[in-house]
Amino acid sequence: MNIKKLSLCIFFATTQVHAFTQWGAGGITPMGHEWLTRTSALEVLNAEHKTSVDPNDPRNTWTSGLAKNIDISTADDEVAKIKSHTNDNSLYAPRSDAVYSAIVGQRWVDLGGMNVANNLISQTGPDCFDAVSQEPADIQQDHFMRRYDDNGQQGGVKSAQRGQERFITHFINAAMATNKRIVVWDGGGSSAKTDVDYNYFLFGRAVHLFQDSFSPEHVVRSPSDNYEKVRQVKAYICTEGAEQHAHSTGAVLDYTSGDVIWKVGTKTDTGWGGYKASNMKPVALVAMEASKDLWAAFMRTMSVDINEREKYARNEAQVLIDKWMSFDKDEMEHWYDNENNRDNTYVKVDGDTGKGKLQKECMSGLSAKNRYGATIKPKTQKELVDVLDDSRRYCLFNIEAEPGYADANDPYLNIPFNWRWKSNSWLVPNASWQQKQLDRDTGKIIKIKEFTNNQELTVDSIENNYSIVTGAKKPLSLVRVPGDGGKSFYLRSKDNPYLFFSYSDKKNGRIKLWHSPNQAEFEILPGNNIFNLKNTYWNQYVWYDKNSKGAYLTEKGSPDNASSKWIISEEN
């Protein structure tokens, strides 16, 4: 079978591997990660609004596996902000924009914005869903899984340690990110652009990794402690000395897969009435309890002053690891010495005569697409990894940021959050080309003042077609986004990422917010702490009219005139 079938089944069962399942098109597979993420948040906030109290909730009788610390009494301001910024998305019913953003963020980890059913430029090319967002060795820690070369029981220790370290990194990055909104692709059975809170979107990365550390397809946990501790870590591409993640789409559809959070037999409980604790598998319910701790920790963290937040975030992340992602190194290094701990997916290391299969036998069930779109059946693990690496390189060469959005990138998948194909046919990289490592965030938040009277540019409403003036109701914060060639910039609204510092028709030339980056690229030309703004399309300068209190882009602008000079400051 394919590593991940791009078939009608995978269209319905959006991401069958590398995660608790995500919602599938048409509701064929219900929410998985999304349910854990939204419900844990709403339980912490006491804000559930779609489901009723479940009288058969197993947690009522539990003594372990429950959240340890959901105290948010020190985070009143952050909680108030979360509750005030509502979101009425009908699919997830998140109630809050922060919750919605985290849901989209955790989905991104699996999907990378890819349309799973149609993620190709053409069929004569690589499978970029696999090659970019699922299979690279260096992103396995985002799913709390082994790399292909994490062999033996020590490989489980190394992968668990890397997963813990990556979790801390994601938690801190989310807490310390610039406060702004960004546009991202939300992939799956279909794909669509959406805008999200940047901090909580990045928090979704930490949420995803954290929740994946509970999936029985990713790790071994035990009911003896109600799944609180990690015993071993599984693999996906026939790693020796490890149990393997299942490759069956059918197991997702009938709920027998460990990645499905719902009990077998509950598929007929459709609609919101089926989303209840008594329908959840025990380990998934523990994952939801742990996610409550995660949400509370992040709310507390976001309430801390930015100058002290990084240290606080690191401490909170470590506490979460100690409570929910810990393992006994000695136990893990000897876990598979007991053959009763090996299931029928276990791949033996060389010289092991006990229970399990050889890597060659495991590899016989795998296939993948190469860069030309041909299905190959590799005989060795290395051959498969080489095919995937080559396809990844080919895919990345064909991806670029949408104009005006090159500031926000995923440095792990190494693609922009708002990306596009460079062409409608595959472009071929030369033999020496390698994708450069993208920076996480190259945008700078700026404010602009007119030079003559030192008045800040403002706007009456952060909406399309509103003129940018002085003395209006709302301050205007802009993200300075690198443009083509690195010498010019787009100026995008910090608070509405679809809007750009642009102009009306050339006859009038009034500067305004506009819902397109087209012809809205500017050079920012310095001189003695003041600047000129030169539009690269018209080669004209932005100037200020004190009578109308507005800014304009016409031939009247001149770099030497005081009216064409601007004071630009960066926000901390």
Swiss-Prot record:
Q: Which organism is it from?
A: Aeromonas salmonicida
Q: Does the keyword Disulfide bond apply?
A: no
Q: Does the keyword Nucleotide-binding apply?
A: no
The entry's function note states:
Bacterial hemolysins are exotoxins that attack blood cell membranes and cause cell rupture by mechanisms not clearly defined.
| This protein's UniProt keywords | Cytolysis, Hemolysis, Toxin, Virulence
Question: What's an example of a GO molecular-function annotation for this chain?
Answer: toxin activity
Single Gene Ontology BP term?
killing of cells of another organism
* Name of the protein described by the UniProt record: Hemolysin-1
Q: Which residues form a coiled coil?
A: none
InterPro entries (alphabetical): PLipase_C/P1_nuclease_dom_sf
Query: Organism's domain of life?
Result: Bacteria
